[in-house]
Swiss-Prot record:
Boundaries of every Glutamine amidotransferase type-1 domain copy: 290-539
Gene Ontology BP term (one): pyrimidine nucleobase biosynthetic process
One Pfam family from the record: GATase
Catalysed reactions listed for this entry: UTP + L-glutamine + ATP + H2O = CTP + L-glutamate + ADP + phosphate + 2 H(+); L-glutamine + H2O = L-glutamate + NH4(+); UTP + NH4(+) + ATP = CTP + ADP + phosphate + 2 H(+)
UniProt similarity note: Belongs to the CTP synthase family.
UniProt gene name: pyrG
Enzyme class (EC, first level): ligase
EC number(s) per entry: 6.3.4.2
Annotated region described as Amidoligase domain, given as residue ranges: 1-265
Binding residues for CTP: 13, 146-148, 186-191, 222
Top-level division of the source organism's lineage: Bacteria
Protein name: CTP synthase
Amino acid sequence: MVRFIFITGGVVSSLGKGLTAASLAMLLQAKGFKVCLRKLDPYLNVDPGTMNPHQHGEVYVTDDGAETDLDLGHYERFTGVPACKFDNITTGAVYSKLLKEERLGNYTGLTVQVIPHVTNIIKDFILSNTKGFDFVLCEIGGTVGDIEGLPFFEAIRQIGNELKSKQCLFIHLTLLPYVKTARELKTKPTQHSVKELRTIGISPNILVCRAERKIAKSEIEKIALFCNIDPEYVIPAIDQKNIYLVPLAYHDYGLDNKVLKFFNLTIAPSKLNRWHDIIERLKESHSKVRIAIIAKYHKLKDAYKSVIEALDHAGIYHKYKVDLVWINAENVTNENISKKLLGVDGILVPGGFGERATEGKILAVNYARTNNIPFFGICLGMQLAAIEIARNLVGLKDAVTEEFKTAGTKIIERISKHDEDFNPSDITIENIKKTMRLGSYTCNLVSDSITANAYGELKISERHRHRYKFNNDFQDIFEKNGVKFSGFSEDKKIVEAIELPKLLWFVGVQFHPEFKSKPFEAHPLFIRFVEAAIKYNKNN
């Protein structure tokens, strides 16, 4: 019998519902249960694929090509269970399906309403594709009281009534703000949040209280009294220095055991060895290595969430603290680049879209190459590395990408360039995914290359999100100038990896390795990149 756990939030957004859901799922997994995590987002976009990173943060790509919320990255990193298109839904996707069904006449002339038609689609999403799982954890985006979230709260309220307590549990995450002048945590916002949740028919079974310091027993008892919850089910969520400390903190407070007790399930011992190993490695990470990220959205770190985490994972692997140096690519010039990158041990250019800030990134590639600083280019980062090499090593001074320029030598071209049915005027928000290469694809690596040696195998599968590729017409001239093409798609039409073997570590990949990195299984390319940065640090 599958059991459903709904995680909601109140008081403020960005409290850590995703981390709480991921941590609990991992803890249940450690007790031998099979878990599934899902995110329900109340915004009207069909998916986050075309949303501005300033608005949404990173778009997390799954194996099956779904463009999803960044919280699914947390889910995968904590549990190791691959997410899929069935694990994320938005209000936009709900209404898109609803209107399609209505136009097809599938509602047989009924008045289509939020209740029951919208809520039924949400319920169907939650209850479908659950075979083989012991627990399905659903995170509801936003906070209680948000008008756009009401259909989702109504849907889970109905599920709670239909399944009863034997199959359904509600966890509510709130904030206990600390008022310095009063020198105490304030419980009133939590009381009001629970009250708001109850007005829509949901009574939380477990209350998780986020705070910046330890919560006193008297404060827990006060919260329990006014929120009508047993003190045993009021769980502290104290700020941690590292997100990978969160699961064991919840375990210490007994969150996993309280959930099993609620469902009247046997409380088995937890197998948490690999998480204890992570904690020990973090404690032993005294030395530092500095990695510069040449970013377009340097002020919004969530736009590069998986890259940040993948670097952290490599640091955990090597028992090194990875200090990130954020560089605004728009402000990089020939005159200031040496000052901006002074003292860094590695340079990373992440993926992205749009022309803005690309020339600054190209300058950073040049600085890494000419100073033999370890370099890692991902997706657009690889393409810009190819342009830098073309301009300054191969001699093609007018090298450009077709994505931004119509004039010049097009080192980077559109994947669909040779598709007979392709028409540039057809690229709209509605059909833009038709030109995008999304999801996992097999890559064949070249033996005795940096990339192949990192993986330890010649056939790999990695996730992609791009519509442009290296122009294979220039492969020969690049090779004559020392470039090694170390990875190709199965049909050999798409270059998947390039490298400069004579340098300490210079690798560009078309795919997104960061999406597959985990704290207990760091991605091999990030392991080798950070390893090269450590070596550079020791020698300079």
